[in-house]
Amino acid sequence: MAKITKEIVFGNHKLILETGEVARQADGAVMASMNGTQVLVTVVWKKDGGESNDFFPLTVNYQEKFYAIGKIPGGFNKREGRPSDNETLISRLIDRPIRPLFPDNFFNEVQIIATVLSLNPEVSPDIIAMIGASAALSISGVPFNGPIGAARVGYKDGVYLLNPSRKEQEESKLDLVIAGTKDAILMVESEAQELSEDIMRGAMLYGHEMMKNVIKSIEELARDVGKSKPEWKAPEIDTVLKARINDVARNEVEAAYLIKDKQQRYQRLGELREQTISALLAENDELNADVIANMFGELERSIVRNRILDGEPRIDGRDHRTVRPISVRTKFLERTHGSCLFTRGETQAIVVATLGNERDAQILDGISGESRDRFMLHYNFPPYSVGETGQVGSPKRREIGHGRLAKRALMAVLPDANEFPYVLRIVSEITESNGSSSMATVCGTSLALMDAGVPLKAPVAGVAMGLIKEGDRYAVLTDILGDEDHLGDMDFKVAGTEKGITALQMDIKISGITNEIMERALEQALEGRTHILGVMNNALAEHRTELSQHAPRITTMKVAEDKIRTIIGKGGATIKGLIESTGVSIDIDDSGVIQLFSPDKIALEEAQKQIKALIAEIEVGQTYQGKVSKIVDFGAFINLLPGKDGLLHISQICAARTQKVEEVLQEGQEIEVFVAGIDKQGRVKLEWKDKPQAEAKEVEDAPVSATFLTMEEQSEEINSGNKISEEEE
């Protein structure tokens, strides 16, 4: 196939889609480029074998190559390894809008691989990868009801920004990624700084409108390639069997969905499913048990959806707008820094906040460069939370995605590092789940952080919205259950403060979501969020004024840059000595900011005291308790401050000209001295403050000039006695 190229004006950028030159043995391959960022996206699908599957085996792998930015990977092997969290999240970003566009009952294996080959740091590759995946699918011949487009939308000074650069994004109050077909929005992922519902809705509509030009160009590319799609027909529905299942099971299934307890309801539905399969196989042993089970599921879906659309109570008895009962317990765990048990209906999370110092920040080494993450949020979904057995270990894609959504919801309200210098780690342990566990994590995180004494700018709550739509009839549901998510048409999660939205995630399974439906969903989400915030504020309205007794303390000091070397010492000896003697963790940066970290308040105060002494300057007219550090023929050097000595002249020590300094003072002896002066060369002249009067008189009467050398005459000796030599500096 000859090389085919499409150039698309996309905001301030030019998007280029190319096929026919690279990866020609894949069913579909597109090189998507934008201002120096290039992503190769390939699609391969199996033409048969789907009959043996009862699910759709779609796999999306997004991978970043370090050579794309001219870097060599770190680590022992010096090659790319397991996917980073960012790669996993972008894989999900590609997967979510395209998965609903494959036909029902299409179970053939499909694999999409997106590889970043070249990276301009100012142009994010995620949008390019999403568009490339859409184009590759459209030319692959796989049954696909696309194409889709994708766009990133920012918001600054009342203006929406299309595909902002990284620099522009840093100044934006919104980071919204949207994907959809020319007729409908399918997926939204966003982080915002407390923006209103109207601004968020406007951003979605703006992004959807802007991507239509991309969709049109992909359609043209597919026509130019001209690959014919193989005949694929969905299996014919056995209407007789469907009617028979309805006759056998409908009444019992309707009754089962009146059981409000999830586990009891699931147990009863499982029994009914097995009874139905057994009864129908007894009537006709040629029937397929899996087909019967799938049709039984369709019956469940029909019953639940029609009941809601008819205005009847939902599965757990609520109306469309009511939030499930909520209970909150802060200080749930005794020795953690902050904790919360958040329960909403049959969804429950133990959320724990831990405070650390700068050394605990997570180092992220990706192709965009190394960075440090001061706020980590880890979401765990153990199998017992849904009454099942399963593997426990590394987080799965879903856990990484849910954790990132909850993290995004809190980013807008975190205190600045100079106001609260702690590194924060949140762990959310989902102990029960029946829908919206990510939003329970948002609520629990806000409470756990405030319980730990973190001064959040405002509390944050989240709620998951659902949709049931048949023709022109629809119902928007607040705080959906797991079954309502599974059997419904939309999962729309909204988190925010009383002031506005901080995070929004939407996945839609159908086309035709109107502006009216979106407006209704946002309005109900605000109502639900406000209610949840009220319950949370009744439990803990503001952050605790004192940190937990088990939490470490951080003190920050600022010193002049020319004092950094003094604190560190030769080969780090001084700072190591401070750390060993006090047990305090000490970090100092190039600007002179020192961070002291310890669970022991007394140790912190001691470390501060020692550092202040290290950088303190000797002042004329002040009295110091010094220690004799060195005795010389013409006097004694007295250590006043760490690394700083002064000279106590022999005339201030000895009463007679025949007396030696060693007869009066010994090294290590402590005496009180007065700083009489400091000359231009920085030499410190001392007087012995508590020298006996008799000795003082005798010294005054003695011909000092004939017996002792003056300070000026001993300048070389004085300089040689300084504690910090030029070599040490």
Swiss-Prot record:
Chain sites annotated for binding Mg(2+): 485, 491
Cofactor: Mg(2+)
Subcellular location: Cytoplasm
GO biological process: mRNA catabolic process; RNA processing
Enzyme class: transferase
InterPro entries named in the record: ExoRNase_PH_dom1, ExoRNase_PH_dom2, ExoRNase_PH_dom2_sf, KH_dom, KH_dom_type_1, KH_dom_type_1_sf, NA-bd_OB-fold, PNPase
Superkingdom as given in the UniProt entry: Bacteria
EC number: 2.7.7.8
Pfam families recorded: KH_1 (PF00013), PNPase (PF03726), RNase_PH (PF01138), RNase_PH_C (PF03725), S1 (PF00575)
Known catalytic reactions: RNA(n+1) + phosphate = RNA(n) + a ribonucleoside 5'-diphosphate
Keywords of this entry: Cytoplasm, Magnesium, Metal-binding, Nucleotidyltransferase, RNA-binding, Transferase
Domain KH: 552-611
A single Gene Ontology CC term: cytosol
SMART domains (UniProt xref): KH (SM00322), S1 (SM00316)
Record domain S1 motif: where: 621-689
Principal localisation: cytoplasm
Oligomer status and interactors: Component of the RNA degradosome, which is a multiprotein complex involved in RNA processing and mRNA degradation.
PANTHER family cross-referenced by the UniProt entry: POLYRIBONUCLEOTIDE NUCLEOTIDYLTRANSFERASE, POLYRIBONUCLEOTIDE NUCLEOTIDYLTRANSFERASE 1, MITOCHONDRIAL
Described purpose of this protein according to its UniProt entry: Involved in mRNA degradation. Catalyzes the phosphorolysis of single-stranded polyribonucleotides processively in the 3'- to 5'-direction.
Stored HAMAP family: PNPase
NCBIfam families per UniProt: polynuc_phos, PRK11824.1
Family to which the UniProt record says this protein belongs: Belongs to the polyribonucleotide nucleotidyltransferase family.
Protein name: Polyribonucleotide nucleotidyltransferase
UniProt organism field: Legionella pneumophila (strain Lens)
The encoding gene: pnp
